[in-house]
Amino acid sequence: SILFSDSSFCAQQGYDTATIACLFVPNTYEVYWNISIENLMKRMKKENENFWNAQRTIKADALGLSKEEVCTIASIIDEETANNAEKPMIAGMYINRLNAGMPLQADPTIKFALKDFALKRIYHNMLQFDSPYNTYKNTGLPPGPIKIASVAGIYAVLNRTAHDYLYMCAKE
């Protein structure tokens, strides 16, 4: 993880320290224990290129989003819900907020900014925390994903439910 904080290492991979998590596509990979970091990164780049096929890239472009932006939204959605059936609806809401120029107001980004994913509830005083990941204080997307986005999360963004919703209410 020290390498992922190294801006020159991340730049060699085509990312920065905020977006390096976008390189990784969750899957099961077979690699040998003695693989070099260089060869592992080459493998991850190849897997990433295979994942981001023409169809997925066209869908991202149609939304006006880069691959990194898709992964960033997906990472937030993944932290909002574990229910894959809900993810396209939530994706639609966040994309509506972005298109309206509204702050995302995504609680998972506050958890990330505070470095405490165990938080069950976000309180008003937490919303004042100064961070580029605070989507209550800042409009637009945070600098990068808050975790490695799941394939289901990415799929939800690329196939978001089209609706006019700007808000949601969690049951728990």
Feature-to-residue mapping (PLM):
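Bacterial extracytoplasmic/cell-wall-associated proteins, especially those involved in peptidoglycan
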Residues: 3-172
